[in-house]
A protein has these predicted regions:
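Short, electropositive alpha-helical surface patch
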Residues: 92-102
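Residue-level detector of beta-propeller blades
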Residues: 30, 152-154
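N-terminal basic/disordered segments at the start of proteins
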Residues: 3-29
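Dinucleotide-binding Rossmann-like beta1-alpha1 core, especially the glycine-rich loop
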Residues: 80
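Helical "lid/coupling" subdomains associated with nucleotide-phosphate turnover
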Residues: 5, 19, 43-68, 83-90, ...
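A short acidic Gly-Thr/Ser loop motif
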Residues: 9-14, 135-141, 203-206, 287-289
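Short acidic/polar active-site loop segments enriched in Thr and Asp
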Residues: 13, 76, 281
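N-terminal glycine-rich anion-binding loops that anchor highly charged ligand groups
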Residues: 28-39
């Protein structure tokens, strides 16, 4: 696989691009992410599904811009997929042929099941949870993927999307019809005869927007959307307030950004209906989806689209890019494990902290690559932002703080105040900092 790879996802509402750089066999990092609200499906559901000229031109110009960025980053491989709008459009070949002839880019139009599968591959590899159902709300469709023990059990796609619901129902003020349409489609989820988990992983712009609003409302300390988790019942009031809003000013007061005014009510309506009907108790927000799934199915094509056991892509990527002495890092990790076991009769910490101590020990010197004298502070920022994949928020905050106070005086209450919501008690943090010293 190429060292630098570009993946473009042409959705019904947004077009997104990620550029990813490999640092070793399975490790990689994101070097660019670009999004454009091209709304390629705009007007199509009122016109027999046919793509309209102006939206197609917007999408074409955005693709041209994306490819310029990709070329500037010296990407050697471009994977481009298109989802609901293009697979449904009778005239999709007009757009596909123009892009192929003018830009030299082959777009692969994927079916709904494949779209769902890509979301499942991304979340099962890049989130820490083992059992969940993905809910990926797009402009034209919504995908569901059942995951258990990090294995994909079933992938399905339904023609429920924000733009579709907006044009067919909301624009005609037919809210009752929208609800009936969604519930009728959701019967397919229950027909799979698979137990529906109480935990859902939310994918897509509408769901990420809702999560960001919840984070802001609750003054959540970590500015990271991927892996953010919330209790559904605790946040239903926000969903209801969005649906009650009559003007854009009211939406803005609730925390909705301007670029989401046009579909946030439809997205919230779809999401709330699904959560209620499937009796979902907890939502984990995913910052990854189809694009990362496309990349991972290529990267992991010889390993059943799964990382090896005990492999963490975030840890390996940080070590590849910033660790100055790989052997020393491995030595520190093994040493930390021994220290934890020897002192266990004194600290009585759960074994989950042993794994975090090992990770902290391996990564504690990555900050030296930027500045030796500020290495702990540098490492703190690297870890807080770099342990993005396959880590719960609590875990990455614990690792970052453990490293921050290594070879320093033990942390005090004031040192952990900002992130106390995500940290264990002070005594636990003092033990971890002591053992890494």
């Amino acid at each position: 696989m190429s060292k630098i790879t570009t993946v473009i996802d042409i959705g019904s509402n947004s077009m997104r691009m990620v550029v990813l750089e490999k640092s070793s066999r399975f490790a990689f990092s994101l070097i660019n992410e670009t999004k454009s609200r091209v709304k390629i499906s705009e007007g199509c559901y009122e016109n027999g599904g046919n793509l309209q000229e102006i939206p197609m031109e917007r999408a074409y110009q955005s693709l041209k811009s994306f490819l310029n960025i990709s070329n500037a980053l010296k990407s050697r491989k471009v994977l481009c997929v298109a989802t609901s709008a293009l697979r449904d459009a009778p005239n999709s070949k007009v757009f596909l042929n123009r892009v192929k002839n003018d830009l030299g880019l082959s777009i692969k139009v994927i079916d709904g099941e494949k779209e769902s599968y890509f979301g499942g591959v991304a979340t099962s590899n890049l989130l820490h949870d083992d059992e969940f159902i993905t809910i990926d709300i797009g402009g034209g469709s919504t995908e569901f993927c059942f995951v258990k023990d990090k294995k994909i059990l079933k992938s399905i796609s339904l023609n429920i999307g924000t733009v579709r619901i907006k044009e067919l129902y909301f624009n005609k003020n037919n809210i009752k019809g929208a609800k009936e349409y969604i519930l009728e489609n959701l019967k397919k989820v229950f027909e799979q005869n698979i137990d529906i988990p109480s935990k859902a992983v939310g994918i897509g712009g509408s769901i990420r927007t809702l999560s960001k609003m919840i984070m802001d409302k609750n003054e959540y300390p970590l500015d990271a959307i991927h892996g953010f988790t919330y209790n559904v019942n605790a946040e239903k009031k926000l969903f209801e307030n969005i649906l009650k809003a009559d003007t854009n000013d009211e939406l803005q007061e609730l925390g909705v950004k301007k670029d989401r005014f046009d579909t946030i009510k439809e997205g919230t309506f779809i999401f709330k209906t699904i959560l209620d009907e499937l009796d979902i108790k907890e939502v984990v927000t995913s910052g990854v989806g189809v694009r990362e799934g496309v990349y991972l199915t290529d990267l992991l094509r010889n390993s059943n689209h799964r990382f090896p056991n005990n492999f963490n892509v975030s840890v390996k990527s940080l070590l590849d890019r910033f660790e100055l002495n790989e052997k020393q890092s491995a030595y520190f990790g093994n040493n930390a494990k021994k220290i934890f076991e020897v002192l266990k009769p004194l600290h009585n910490l759960d074994d989950k902290f042993k794994e975090l101590l090992v990770v902290s020990s391996k990564l504690h010197s990555v900050g030296s690559s930027l500045n030796f004298y500020k290495k702990n502070d540098n490492a703190f920022e690297f870890i807080l932002n770099g342990l993005n994949y396959d880590f719960q928020h609590t875990s990455r905050v614990i690792v970052a703080h453990t490293i921050k106070f290594s070879k320093k005086s033990l942390p005090k209450h004031s040192d952990i105040e900002e992130y106390k919501e995500l940290l264990p008690n002070l005594e636990t943090m003092q033990w971890l900092s002591f053992m890494i010293a």
